[in-house]
Amino acid sequence: MKKLKFNVTGMSCAACQAHVEKAVSKVNGVMDVNVNLLANKMTVDLDEDVTNAQAVINAVESAGYGANEIGDKENKTASPVAAAQDESKKMKKRLWWSVGFLIPLFYICMGHMANIPIPPIFTGHKNMMIYALTQLLFTVPIIAINFHYFSNGFKNLIHRSPNMDSLIALGAAASFIYSVYGTYRMAYFMGRGDLGSAHEYMMNLYYESCGMILTLITVGKYLEARSKGKTADAVNKLVSLAPKTAVIIRDSEEVEVPAENVMVGDVFLLKAGWSVPCDGVLIDGNCTVDQSALTGESIPVDKAVGDRVMSASVSAGGFAKVRCEKQAKDSTLSQIIALVEDASASKAPVARLADKISAVFVPIVITIALISLVVWLLLGYSFAFALNMAISVLVISCPCSLGLATPTAIMVGTGKAAQFGILIKSAESLETAHSIDTVVLDKTGTCTEGKPELISAQAFGDFDVSELKKLCGSAESGSSHPLAKAVTGHCKTNGIELSPAESYTETAGGGISAVVEGRNVLIGNKRLMDNSGVDVSAAEKTAHAHADNGEIPLYVAIDNKFAGILFIADKIKETSAEAIEGFKKAGIETVMLTGDNEKTARAIQKKLGISQVRSQLMPEDKATIIKELQEQGKKVAMIGDGINDAPALTTADVGIAIGAGQDIAIESADIVLMKSDLNDAVTAVKLSRSVMKNIKENLFWALIYNSLGIPLAAGVFYGLLGWKLNPMFGAAAMSLSSVCVVTNALRLNLFKSSRENKAAKAEINTKTEDGKMKKVMKIDGMMCSHCTGTVTKVLNAIDGVTADVSLEDKCAYITLDKNVADEVLSKAVTDAGYKVKGIK
């Protein structure tokens, strides 16, 4: 099966979307089709052995629309709002020309109602034909300017797939044709001297209704096009980050080339203020990089030789040479844009109701309009009255508002998430996340830093600690397990010389064994020792005491004799407790899974306030526990690293990969967090809830609008309350309904992440009685009084800042007389050669 993408032209409403989907789904070999009205794009899953792209294009064209395949070579960083901007410009031009002809038309038709003097040539019985023909002359250009409504509308009627343009075309055409008919009847009666009958027809001309309907629809389309452009602002900002050029080293010379021409293996320069053109690795120099646009992290990150940099990051200082690892078209930025656009173009399950309604909406509206016409004629009302009712039904009905209700909110929501470094892969994932009531957390790398350290060691029997560390470090040197790295890292840091290890064996969920200097070394948990017949009872009291403090005990046996115990701790992330509290406030239960012993797990549970904990688990147990929770009726999200937790992430209702960095294409995850901050998972769930609330609001008002508007236009309330809707007001209402839906979706841009809300609260709480604000900046790299003096100087040089720097605390205590962004404070200190760890 292959996934193909197409641009689709000619769609104007949800009915168009439904017709295209229906036509393509009938093609033999098409497995799935998804059409996005907002983006004018279509995604098709097809069997290449049965069909091809041309067959899909033919199906779209046979339905009355146009399509072309989006090739792999198309620029992935092309602006997603370009089409909306072009559409907006075209609509604006049509609008001004339409208004130019509508104003004199209304002046002639309605001027007398506003007591505006009208030239005598347009008044009186003798001038009735001049009055009518002048209206005709001003209406024809408006029809010509907006003729696409008629061409598209009637073409789709012929193809038996009527859409919103069909409703507009029928309503405007009916007004115009009846008015032309009335003009001819006026001429007929005036030629026979029957001025009374001619006057009666003159009073029932609808030229101004025809002109006003078309102009008001164009007003709505113009505003809608502008709003559509704004829904993709987040992606457009990402696109604008990509630098146009890069400076590469070629034949020992600096050469400026287009960014897309930087090839894998090329070496490019990175200076202060320059943007990174593509993903790469530093091979010389060092720099400080601002990755905020990609990850949402405001503090610049120091990069040294061997470190990776991401495309569209900005160098905040330093000089470096970087080797290109991925071209611009395959870079992290391009992947982010592709993910966000794919998510925006996907369809949420909540949209199915709107799709079903849209598929039959226009035929039903046309039927209601015809019924309205016939009923009012049967009730004895004039043809002009009945026609007025039918036209009102046609022009007030709005399938657009239904079609835009979901995709606008999805596009804004996924774009907003990307600004926070949260990548949501599909609309379905976004919808599912809003109903999550249980979050399962992997301990290592999610709740903790994922970088265990050897804290202490205790030898037993005839063994000493130095010997214990050397043998353990040597045995673990062949393992890539985080606990093994903690042991070998400690040995390296403390200059402990290691020996080669032989016969290395790893027991999943237990530990390792190896032969070092002819001695059998066994390292692992108590279960491994018990299974190997090693008695560790002498160390159990000590092990429990350390485990109560969150440390992991690793038992060591040498030549099948208990030799000692290593204590390893994985530091809890600073933001983990805050994130767990955030989940609690959102009504979400938290469950931590770990392979550690129960004592260690309980200690971490207590520190973080986690609801439940499952310990001493094998890797395959995580997916089983998630299934158990799902069987209890819970909606489960799993948060892990996306590699070791792949089965669990796939099993969960929503899989969230944390700390992905450049590796954002994790297939097992539905949501990818660029940073290792658990708060972003809280933000993802809260954003999902906001998006779903917005979608439901949009669908509710779209359905209510049509449910009330159509009966009102048909005259249901005329007999009871005397309410009668003029077609012009119906057209205005239809135009505004779509604009209101899009505008409501744009409110999601006001959503704030957990980090932003925390910062806002901190800002309020740090204000002193005199209105000044206080902040504390943690700084690395200060070694002496000269350092503190330098930091004090650069901070005090900023307008509105008074700083007191403490060498002992490694902090700057800042008082602000006015609002100064954290980024400004950080940059000043970073440029001075120091590292900012955080600002509170």
Regions found by a protein language model. Name each.
Residues 1-132, 142, 252-254, 334, ...:
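Flexible metal-binding regulatory segments at protein termini and peripheral loops
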Residues 18, 353, 436, 516-518, ...:
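Conserved ATP-binding TGD loop and adjacent catalytic N/P-domain core of P-type ATPases
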Residues 28-47, 54, 205-207, 236-330, ...:
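Conserved cytosolic catalytic loops of P-type ATPases
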Residues 73, 79, 186-190, 195-197, ...:
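Juxtamembrane coupling segments of multi-pass membrane pumps/enzymes
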Residues 90-245, 356, 457, 722-727, ...:
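Transmembrane helix-loop-helix hairpins at the membrane interface
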Residues 93, 313, 437-480, 510-591, ...:
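ATP-driven catalytic headpiece of P-type ATPases
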Residues 114-130, 158, 177, 416, ...:
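Membrane-embedded alpha-helical bundles of multi-pass transporters
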Residues 138-149, 173, 209-239, 345-441, ...:
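Hydrophobic alpha-helical transmembrane segments
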